[in-house]
């Protein structure tokens, strides 16, 4: 092959994998460079050799082959340059990671080497905080019968979602605030003097929803206001209720259309605000209110109070130090031998306080 300094090599513009050979319109000679109409440069004609293998790029005739040694009598102006073969690189950890949302079944899909998702060790589990039970599209729990069912019915959605997706291990333990700890009982008990009944008030989205204790009716107007719906739609829903009571006198949280407990539960479940109003729809709501009340403090407080400190003027300063020492300190000092080693610093602090009081009394008398 002749060396031409001005020669430029081009990639083929023809389909090299096709069986049909391209016959030139005129015969070319391989002795001198000829003019190329496409590139407007002087190029040299190289023999194009067809192989029986389907991949023509991998099996291209050697460039040093003369036209007389070529097996084919056709000449092509362009030739194919084979791409260099690189050794197969080992898969990165990102390629070995199983992505649940990118897995295509029954296909040869290979994940790219782009770091889409960090590889987590198998002992690390998801805390389940992203499974928010207050999401509007989650399943709503059934009506809670008593307080013992609250610990069972609340994480119902977490179990159903975790069962549907086995790749995600949803647990109730969270490092910070879990999704179930947000739902704390926040009931306010008020007295409705006009109706002579107790009302249970729960706030959601800045609106107080009230439930009566005598007949368990709920203020439907405030209930639907939690959903932020329009006034026309709210009045249309309440107007279609067969059993309702209209209250026009009283506080703002008492005014409105009152509907039965069962109908209010259905509306709250349909509008997906049932979890926001917990524990308003607990049937035994009195037990939750009673559980929040402080226990009897009389059983926790000691029956005998320590004797008051006496300070009487006297000439003897040593007698003052013995009088201002409380009896409780004497009892603790006498029983110090029976206490554990962990309580000794507490007794030492009491003695330091007693010495400070003694020195203060001496300074006042002097």
Curated annotation (Swiss-Prot):
Organism field: Saccharomyces cerevisiae (strain ATCC 204508 / S288c) (Baker's yeast)
Keyword field contains Nucleus: yes
Composition bias, Basic and acidic residues: 312-328
Family: Belongs to the EFG1/PHD1/stuA family.
Residue ranges constituting the HTH APSES-type domain according to the UniProt record: 186-292
GO molecular function: DNA-binding transcription factor activity; sequence-specific DNA binding
Key words of the record: DNA-binding, Nucleus, Transcription, Transcription regulation
Biological function: Putative transcription factor that functions in pseudohyphal growth.
Miscellaneous notes: Present with 1420 molecules/cell in log phase SD medium.
Short name of one Pfam family: KilA-N
Protein name, UniProt field: Putative transcription factor PHD1
Subcellular location: Nucleus
Region (Disordered): 294-366
Cited InterPro entries: EFG1/Phd1/StuA (IPR029790), HTH_APSES_sf (IPR036887), KilA/APSES_HTH (IPR018004), Tscrpt_reg_HTH_APSES-type (IPR003163)
Listed PROSITE patterns: HTH_APSES
Coiled coil stretches, renumbered: none
One Gene Ontology cellular component annotation held by this UniProt entry: nucleus
DNA-binding region of this protein: 220-241
UniProt-listed GO biological process terms: positive regulation of pseudohyphal growth; positive regulation of transcription by RNA polymerase II
